[in-house]
């Protein structure tokens, strides 16, 4: 009879909780709480629709810089992560009053900067003390922090907006402070990191072309997710005229799906392999986004919210798993994942700025979703190219 693996020791559980909290604050709240806030910002007259969309793009631009800078903080995660979380909380408090547009751009950029750095350092810091047999489950729990932020903001923000827009910003900031303080001592001790293995990994064997193509796929995936991440609530609230409450309701569905997405896609990969699971997931995204081009009824909104919501955090374990299949060296795996995170950030930032310009000129949400479906079609094509290249590489080894 197979024995159930023992529960993680308290120190491991605290580290997992701390990393989950970091992604909850740095990504779940810092990025996704803005989605239900966006139509309220427009309705309150703080900014116009085009300016409000640019604020979402500013966050993604900061995320790119944070992902690049985050590698330098990995050796100091136990000290850097809580400070980054507090800085994230400060960005909400700074936006609690109708101040000039440049002020909001600055703080939304900072919130992206801290979130990108937390995405790079949080999970590795916690997972290095988790037993190998439990890292899959632990990773799923950590990335669930993103989904919890999406779902939590979808429930909390509409309630706070009944008090006032400024109160909503300030309360989300206070929540981020509370979560940071509660998990501060959960981070595991830092360890010194040597540059020797990294230098050897980057200057030794040639870099596989299949890995490069896969990293590009991850960037295209990021671009395809932006229409839902930034514009879904605004599409329902203003585009369909259903109101902020309805838009936030679908955002809760989106977030609830995001909390379980990594585990679902991970289980699928365990059954059919990461290669096939990634192809299936990309195909699902094409249909789930494309359905909005032909229908905006409840069933279409449910399908798109559930499927795309699950894939926002669920894409990470699939791409990471494929990279681990390509690279058996842990150092090269880490380098590849770092590069993938940076390219993902580039895809998000570039897509966000492009779509903000498009939306400012057209005001048509369906153009944005058409872009998303097209991006996933391109990602699927490139993924199949990467699979063929990798198969040939393995055959010649």
Segments and roles (model prediction):
Residues 66-78, 261-273, 359-360:
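Helix-to-loop junctions at the C-terminal end of transmembrane segments
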Residues 117-130, 314-328:
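Intracellular juxtamembrane helix-capping segments at the cytosolic ends
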Residues 330-362:
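A late C-terminal transmembrane helix in Major Facilitator Superfamily
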Residues 102-111, 299-307:
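Paired small-residue
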Residues 107-145:
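Cytoplasmic helix-loop-helix junction between adjacent transmembrane helices
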Residues 132, 137-188:
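Helix-loop-helix hairpin linking two adjacent transmembrane segments in secondary transporters
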Residues 35, 211-255, 262:
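Extracytoplasmic gate region of multi-pass secondary transporters
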Residues 87-99, 284-296:
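C-terminal ends and interior cores of transmembrane alpha-helices
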């Amino acid at each position: 009879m197979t024995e159930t693996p023992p529960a993680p020791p308290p120190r491991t559980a605290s580290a997992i909780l701390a990393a989950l909290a970091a992604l909850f604050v740095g990504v779940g709240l810092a990025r996704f709480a803005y989605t239900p806030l966006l139509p309220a910002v427009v309705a309150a007259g703080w900014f116009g629709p085009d300016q409000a969309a640019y604020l979402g793009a500013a966050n993604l631009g900061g995320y790119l810089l944070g992902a690049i800078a985050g590698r330098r903080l990995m050796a100091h995660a136990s000290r850097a992560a809580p400070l980054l979380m507090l800085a994230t909380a400060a960005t909400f408090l700074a936006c609690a009053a109708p101040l000039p547009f440049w002020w909001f751009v600055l703080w939304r950029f900072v919130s992206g900067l801290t979130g990108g750095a937390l995405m790079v350092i949080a999970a590795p810091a916690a997972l290095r003390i988790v037993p190998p047999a439990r890292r899959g489950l632990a990773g799923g729990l950590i990335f669930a922090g993103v989904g919890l932020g999406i779902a939590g903001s979808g429930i909390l923000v509409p309630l706070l907006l009944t008090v006032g827009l400024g109160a909503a910003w300030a309360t989300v900031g206070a929540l981020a402070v509370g979560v940071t303080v509660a998990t501060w001592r959960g981070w595991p001790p830092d360890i010194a990191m040597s540059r020797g293995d990294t230098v050897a990994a980057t200057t030794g064997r040639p870099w596989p072309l299949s890995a490069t193509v896969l990293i590009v796929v991850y960037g295209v995936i990021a671009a395809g997710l932006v229409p839902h991440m930034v514009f879904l609530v605004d599409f329902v609230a203003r585009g369909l005229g259903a109101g902020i409450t309805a838009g936030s309701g679908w955002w809760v569905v989106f977030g609830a799906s995001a909390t379980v997405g990594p585990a679902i896609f991970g289980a699928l990969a365990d059954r059919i392999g990461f290669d096939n699971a990634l192809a299936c997931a990309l195909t699902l995204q094409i249909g789930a986004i494309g359905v909005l081009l032909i229908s905006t009824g409840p069933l279409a909104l449910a399908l798109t919210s559930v499927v795309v919501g699950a894939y926002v955090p669920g894409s990470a374990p699939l791409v990471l798993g494929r990279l681990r299949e390509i690279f058996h060296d842990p150092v090269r795996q880490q380098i590849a994942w770092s590069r993938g995170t940076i390219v993902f950030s580039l895809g998000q930032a570039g897509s966000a700025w492009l779509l903000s310009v498009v939306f400012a000129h057209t005001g048509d949400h369906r153009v944005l979703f058409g872009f998303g479906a097209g991006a996933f079609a391109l990602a699927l094509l490139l993924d199949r190219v990467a699979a063929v290249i990798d198969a040939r590489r393995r055959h010649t080894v």
